[in-house]
């Protein structure tokens, strides 16, 4: 089931990115981060109450790890990703994001001595190659300074995300995923709000929630990208090897290219078709492992 959860994560995140792009002309990256994370926290709480999931017996050590994971993986990494997206655009961001799967392989080996098979490495090579082929389109208007900071922020975002989710994998094995998600995103949300208050004052926080919750595209993106995909994402890491989950998650970049044709009126070029085919073959190879 872990592989299915990881694949569904890619599908949900792809929908979310399209919706976030449609909403991005209304709010800045920090505002989008706060709205989507608050939506996720509310969704997790409502689901826990409806399903009557009992509070797990987290140790103090577990709570500290979850809090640090939330601060790094949600509070910092998400902000770095959105800042990178703003500086270098979606095309280059997609290529920088290919560092995610190799980061998971390395960190999973360091944390858990998890060995990745040859099949997974081969599938990863094809999928990442497909992403580069289908998304590469260097924007001429980007300065060298923007390129450097955008790539740096993007790479750090992927590495921090990988480290933060793997740090809570042992906790997820014996505890409900929804509580893990709630604590991580609760800490990330509080961190982002505090940052906004220090940077721009209380008034912008209220404006952010007022405008954000009236933006139907942002709410849709939050539902798919923060509520559904986070639950599926954590479930994928709970029920399968970290390396397999990571490479299935990486397919979201290719799915975004397909969805952009229908929702954003992008053109499905030969280059994109080749990239999609390479990624599909790579996913099949990983699934046969």
Q: Which residue ranges define each predicted feature?
A:
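Hydrophobic/small/kink-forming positions within alpha-helical transmembrane segments
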Residues: 14, 45, 71-75, 102-106, ...
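Hydrophobic/aromatic residues within the transmembrane alpha-helices of Major Facilitator Superfamily
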Residues: 11, 15, 42, 71, ...
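Residues that define the loop-to-transmembrane-helix transition and helix capping
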Residues: 30, 91, 117, 178-179, ...
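Alpha-helical transmembrane segments
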Residues: 69-70, 116, 120-126, 176-188
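Alpha-helical transmembrane segments of compact multi-pass small-molecule transporters, enriched
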Residues: 39-44, 96-110, 125, 187-191, ...
């Amino acid at each position: 089931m872990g592989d299915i959860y990881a694949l569904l994560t890619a599908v949900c995140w792809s929908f979310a990115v399209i919706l976030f792009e449609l909403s991005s002309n209304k709010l800045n990256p920090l505002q989008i981060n706060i709205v989507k994370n608050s939506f996720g926290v509310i969704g997790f709480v409502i689901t826990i109450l409806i399903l009557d999931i009992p509070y797990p017996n987290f140790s103090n050590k577990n709570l500290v790890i979850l809090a640090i994971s939330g601060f790094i993986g949600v509070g910092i990494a998400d902000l770095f990703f959105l800042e990178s997206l703003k500086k270098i655009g979606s095309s280059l961001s997609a290529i920088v994001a290919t560092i995610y799967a190799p980061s998971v392989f390395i960190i999973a080996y360091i944390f858990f001595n998890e060995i990745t098979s040859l099949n997974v490495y081969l599938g990863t090579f094809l999928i990442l190659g497909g992403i580069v082929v289908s998304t590469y389109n260097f924007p001429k208007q980007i300065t060298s300074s923007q390129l450097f900071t955008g790539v740096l922020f993007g790479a750090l975002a992927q590495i921090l995300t990988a480290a933060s989710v793997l740090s809570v994998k042992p906790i997820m094995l014996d505890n409900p995923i929804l509580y893990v998600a709630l604590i991580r995103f609760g800490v990330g949300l509080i961190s982002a709000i505090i940052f906004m208050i220090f940077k721009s004052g209380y008034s912008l926080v209220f404006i952010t929630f007022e405008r954000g919750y009236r933006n139907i595209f942002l709410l849709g993106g939050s539902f798919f990208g923060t509520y559904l995909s986070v639950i599926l994402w954590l479930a994928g890491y709970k029920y399968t090897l970290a390396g397999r989950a990571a490479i299935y998650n990486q397919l979201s970049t290719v799915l975004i290219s397909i969805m952009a044709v229908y929702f954003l009126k992008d053109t499905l070029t030969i280059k994109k078709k080749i990239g999609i085919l390479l990624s599909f073959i790579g996913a099949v190879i990983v699934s046969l492992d």
